[in-house]
């Protein structure tokens, strides 16, 4: 009986209407925005950073071909150079003083550096000529000096003294018995001949060191046999000093420095004159080439007039008369000028 009463009470409680709330519901108060804003900005920055990096990479990759085309494939970083702008203009406006001419007696290498190649070739020939005349008294035993118009190039100059024989003879001519001349055996191979050349060159270099008072040998076999044109300076300077001091030290006739300087200067003047004449000659040939088409046009017009006269019948019958043909040829410009 009691269980039934409990069930009836439970059903009655379920059927009751809910109680009306006597208090107001809680209100949600939003948090201040200022505190969360930095976090949002940081999050946005973190998200945007990879995207920006990818965008920059893509832009750089797209611009790379254009930069390579402009700079030839080499990326260059601009650096400030003081030669730009006012500094550059100031340097350009400042006239440079011409270098004073060197005295060949005191600084022959400086003098050589100031000369044009043709003038140096003239000096080379004169030095070889003095060496041969001093070292080999008999004219028939002398070798032919290489070069055209008494002008010897640097390579020819080195090649002339490469065997060392003339150098050893020069030392003995200036100071008898100074150098023992080595000679190769008959039918000796190239290696044996080269060893003989080295001995003669080194013997001459040792004698020149003692004679000129230098710290080391002024000429070595490498200067003549290995270095090529790079050895020209040492050989030329040594022979030049011997030629200048020959009279003082050995009472032998040396070469005249003033004569060599005059020959070099004459080459410079003649070279300048040749350049000027060539300029006017080219202009005259160009003018003659322009005038030739006019002469051909006039001849063509004359031939056309003759054809018109024959067509109109103004020319009489000339079947029984010999016809004289006049051939006009345009003479060359040089002949016309003469």
Swiss-Prot record:
Protein known as? Calponin homology domain-containing protein
* Membrane topology classification: Peripheral membrane protein
| Domain (Calponin-homology (CH)): residue spans on this chain | 121-247
**What ranges does the record give for the region Disordered, renumbered to this chain?**
1-35, 50-104, 290-338
Q: Which GO terms describe its cellular component?
A: cell cortex; growth cone; plasma membrane
Q: List, alphabetically, the Pfam families matched.
A: CH (PF00307)
Q: Which top-rank group of organisms is this from?
A: Eukaryota
Q: Which Gene3D superfamilies match?
A: Calponin-like domain
Compositionally biased, Basic and acidic residues: which spans?
Answer: 1-18, 87-104
Q: Which organism is it from?
A: Caenorhabditis elegans
